[in-house]
Amino acid sequence: MAGTFSLEPCSTSSSCNHQGKRSESSLLEKRLSEDSSRHWRLQKWASMSSADASRTLLERREEKAAAAENPLVFLCTRCRRPLGDSLTWVASQEDTNCILLRSVSSNVSVDKEQKLSKCRDEDGCILETLYCSGCSLSLGYVYRCTPKNLDYKRNLFCLSVEAVESYTLGSSEQQIVSEEEFFNLESRVEIEKSIKQMEDVLTVMQAKLWEVESKLSKAGRYS
């Protein structure tokens, strides 16, 4: 009996290890899928907005004309407000999952509080945070100060791929705003405010009605 031992703990440990590996594998697959989706969007936008340097001048002109006819419009993923378009496209940054634009729409607000970039190879860059003026979603940042080797990024707007969606202007296959999202956030806020005011008025009227009914009931008993 002294020489006997149980294999159950070992089996349990092995099972836990297998479960842990399956969980890690699932998380890895999800992460790779998300990275692949972001990479695909970057490639799509880049291909729609810039020409390959190896193409002829005529081809580049034709592509530029086509892009001008059907440019991409970038939208906020939360409230679908237009943020900019591919006519101001400069470049894409796959390492940070961002697109660089020369200008943006009035729906993009800038937080004037400046901070240093924490991104790799961007030492010395001073940034200002960008956010959607409609829903306050963080969109990215704008480069305000850069070292000499990154001067080309200065005053460019860097929008995060995760915060931006796009559609092709003039495309009949895509709908800018669905019926469920017809009212923007400002309209919803105003409607909710009006409903709250109506509820308050009804509450006051109900209280007065009860008061009148109470007085009538007492008057009926005394008559």
UniProtKB/Swiss-Prot annotation:
Zn(2+) binds at residues 76, 79, 132, 135. It comes from the Eukaryota. The modification Phosphoserine is found at residues 33, 36-37, 223. Residues 1-30 are annotated as: Disordered. There is a cross-link at residue 153 (Glycyl lysine isopeptide (Lys-Gly) (interchain with G-Cter in SUMO2)). Residues 71-169 form the Mis18 domain. Keywords: Cell cycle, Cell division, Centromere, Chromosome, Isopeptide bond, Metal-binding, Mitosis, Nucleus, Phosphoprotein, Ubl conjugation, Zinc. InterPro entries: Mis18, Yippee/Mis18/Cereblon. It is found in: Nucleus; Chromosome; Chromosome, Centromere. The keyword tRNA processing does not apply. The keyword Metal-binding applies. Residues 21-30 have a biased composition (Basic and acidic residues). GO terms for cellular component: CENP-A recruiting complex; chromatin; chromosome, centromeric region; cytosol; nucleoplasm; nucleus. Residues 9-18 have a biased composition (Polar residues). One of its GO terms (molecular function) is identical protein binding. GO terms for biological process: cell division; CENP-A containing chromatin assembly; chromosome segregation; heterochromatin formation; pericentric heterochromatin organization; protein localization to chromosome, centromeric region. Required for recruitment of CENPA to centromeres and normal chromosome segregation during mitosis. Belongs to the mis18 family. Homodimer, and heterodimer with OIP5/MIS18B. Identified in a complex containing MIS18A, OIP5/MIS18B, MIS18BP1, RBBP7 and RBBP4. PANTHER family: NEUROGENIC PROTEIN MASTERMIND (PTHR16431), PROTEIN MIS18-ALPHA (PTHR16431:SF2). This is Protein Mis18-alpha. It comes from Rattus norvegicus (Rat).
